[in-house]
Amino acid sequence: DGITPMYALRPLVEHNMADSVACEINDRIYCEPGDRMGKVAAGIWPWKCKDALFRYNEVTDTRLNQDGMAYDADSGDGTVYESNYSRQNEGGCVMFCLQEAIHNTFRDNISYDDLGGTISPSENPDALLQDNVYYVRRGVPFVRKNMDGGSFTQVNDRVVELDFAPDK
């Protein structure tokens, strides 16, 4: 993980960059103990926080693992991501992780060529996506497959298709 505040009340995370997170999450580096219950990482995200605010951050080139997205509202209440930028993260732009992540807002952000699926609502009850611009490569789904069971509301979001196909 790049930056992860935990169990915090109103943490403010701004003006940061996370680049190439999770490059070392593999069996060669993490070999003991054998079963680690998944090797997961995201760029910048909170764990069990209340009213976390993430703004003016940039996350690029996060490697695919079970997560691999730039941003992740995970098991907290009231997480806000605003005015952030993400580019070419193999797990997508943002995940709203499961039923404990409530009252999340993702607004005024730019996602450019994030891969695997731009958003992952993952059984989330109530994410709000507002005034974002997503530049999505042709062939990449907007909602990530197998992480699509939650609900979200979009208000004034723009999805712009990039004019090139995925590398083969």
Language-model segment annotations:
Residues 94-96:
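Extracellular glycoside hydrolase catalytic/binding regions
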Residues 100-101, 123-124, 147:
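Repeat-solenoid scaffold signature
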Residues 1-2, 7-34, 40-45, 50-63, ...:
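Right-handed parallel beta-helix
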Residues 70-72, 146:
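Intrinsically disordered, low-complexity regulatory regions of eukaryotic regulatory proteins
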